[in-house]
């Protein structure tokens, strides 16, 4: 026996493979206020007990590996290991379980969503003993939340900057999303803002392509903003997409936007990455820019019910990393979104304290300890007939964003914007008078059509348009 082997044996090391549950399944564990808590939907391979599967998730996302290693004796696993502390069956699913895992705070770098996700949603998602794995929710403890700046400004500061209160904000994504020249693009921006919108938006895949370089687009959009502000007396903005191939280029574009004096820039936070997003968020706070966040690529991660990560986790991560707006689905439009689940993560974006509520998919009580809130953006396949439902679902602290529902108006862009603004003002007035938007919504829109030919024309064009498809990612227990 070699001296090294003797040394290892003398400290209790025993080579080999042992079941994860012997170390990482601890049902007697009482969670701490400083723990990060995770709820995983686990689908074990046939023959793998749920306790072993849950323990494997805790191990492989924290200190464990597939075999015993002698260096375990050089640290305190009891202090640093993740622990699967509870497992429950999923209603209606014989092969799925919810495994609750607690992670000690010391496992994570302060102020880094990147580091947190590298552990919690890292290699463990490819683990062979699991047929599928999905992260349903995270509880971020105040001790960790306080290491983040969060949104650059938040809801109240944005309203003060824009001087707009008592209603949702109105936006429009410029279409076609690709192919316009910078000058024609700026013209569309001007017409929409002059017609009554608060914001217009770059589409998520507009960066700096041969048909429209970013600097030209920024200049023509700034001209459109200032001209429309002068004519309407309202503060206007356009989400200038600063997303780029490098962080340095991204910041350069944000700097140019600041020099132009525009109020807001934009970032694709999933394709751009959390490190880039946090850097841009810090720049925006330091320089008075609002930050609009697009979630391109989210459905690759969150749409399937048994594998990936629910959007509520991505929404929490964005609130930590930083953004003043984020796209959140519409419930009624063309994109996936269950109503109760959407309302759940909308509250997680906006509110300071959110109670556990499994009926809305919220697994943990979340205390944001005064971290600024994020405005949810409803966008994707919506038009004037949707306005009552959108106003009722999302409330005042939201952005209702119409692309084709503005630019597809038969009379042009400005009349499309007028139609949207009239519909919104009618819904807000009716709500303030005590009318039920869910019941009387269509009648409210028809009444407003009498005073707005632009709205009447829009209602005629889109009266038959619906997107009635079943939701893929329903809450457990729903048919």
Curated annotation (Swiss-Prot):
Ligand binding (Mg(2+)): 201, 203-204
Keywords, sorted A to Z: Acetylation, Calvin cycle, Carbon dioxide fixation, Chloroplast, Disulfide bond, Lyase, Magnesium, Metal-binding, Monooxygenase, Oxidoreductase, Phosphoprotein, Photorespiration, Photosynthesis, Plastid
EC number(s) stated in the UniProt entry for this protein: 4.1.1.39
Signal peptide stretch: none
Propiece span(s): 1-2
Family: Belongs to the RuBisCO large chain family. Type I subfamily.
The name this protein goes by in its record: Ribulose bisphosphate carboxylase large chain
Organism field: Arabidopsis thaliana (Mouse-ear cress)
